[in-house]
Amino acid sequence: MKDYVGAHMSIAGGIHNAPERGVKAGCGVIQLFTQNTNQWRGKLISDPDILLFKEKLAESGLNEVISHDIYLINLASAPGEIRDKSLNGFQEEMIRCSRLGIGKIVMHPGSHNGDGEEVGLRRIIEAFDYLIAETPAYSGKILLETTAGQGTNLGYTFEHLRTIIEGSAHPDRFGVCYDTCHTFAAGYDITSAAAYGQVWEEFDRIIGLDRLQCFHFNDSKKGLNCRIDRHEHIGKGAIGATAFSLIMNDPRFAGIPKILETPKGDNNEMDEINLKLLRDMVKQR
């Protein structure tokens, strides 16, 4: 059976290093940034480096690689410099992923910055309609990540994500990345079997389980509905181990990537520890 548990990996020294780092940590899948996250414009990845990445990925045996866009991008921003840079930045991400052979990009929907949720959501829809139409090179999925709802961030309700998907001229191009910390902080409780069942019934009714393409596995330093995004090691936070065990043993999610974004530790040892903890939760059938 293929393994779909993994973690976010650094691309320090070149993007081709990420697959090997993932294997060393014990990953079956990895997530990565395709560029420096503190810069609007990424360094051009040369054709030889693209080829090297693909060779290293093939050698690694990893089952999937997922990209995460840079945090500077805000597709809900008002017309102006930030919106222009966001559109250019996301288009560059789409093109890089096309060249790398990466078929899923995780992204935070954006912040309306006081202009209101309806306005912000409309801007996101318009941005994606433009990006998808103008970037035919990328044929993969865009995964809208659930958010904690800090400040004016959008995406903290399932309804927000549905609005973006259904409002788009290209609804088939979207999936969802369910971040356990973010959704818990936004008020979605999966800490007991009963609550877990209710949340997934709601997700299926509003968005559809077929849209779920990825998990970000993070416990939360803060409590339910706190609207604060603070990641903690698996089982060490306010969510607790039960929720992660429920997901790990849910046959509906067996083939969906589950990506750790928890603290790495002084020597990157914590990914291996958290991955083992998750795999040990799986009950033998």
Curated annotation (Swiss-Prot):
What's any GO biological process attached to this entry? base-excision repair
EC numbers: 3.1.21.2
- Alphabetical keyword list: DNA damage, DNA repair, Endonuclease, Hydrolase, Metal-binding, Nuclease, Zinc
Checking Pfam families in the record gives: AP_endonuc_2
Q: How is the cofactor bound?
A: Binds 3 Zn(2+) ions.
For Zn(2+) 1, which residues are the binding ones?
A: 68, 108, 145
* Molecular function terms from GO: deoxyribonuclease IV (phage-T4-induced) activity; DNA binding; DNA-(apurinic or apyrimidinic site) endonuclease activity; phosphoric diester hydrolase activity; zinc ion binding
Q: Which family does it belong to?
A: Belongs to the AP endonuclease 2 family.
Q: Which HAMAP family match?
A: Nfo
Summarize the protein's role: Endonuclease IV plays a role in DNA repair. It cleaves phosphodiester bonds at apurinic or apyrimidinic (AP) sites, generating a 3'-hydroxyl group and a 5'-terminal sugar phosphate.
Which protein, by its recorded name, is this?
Answer: Probable endonuclease 4
Could you read off the lineage of the organism from its UniProt record? Bacteria, Pseudomonadati, Thermodesulfobacteriota, Desulfuromonadia, Geobacterales
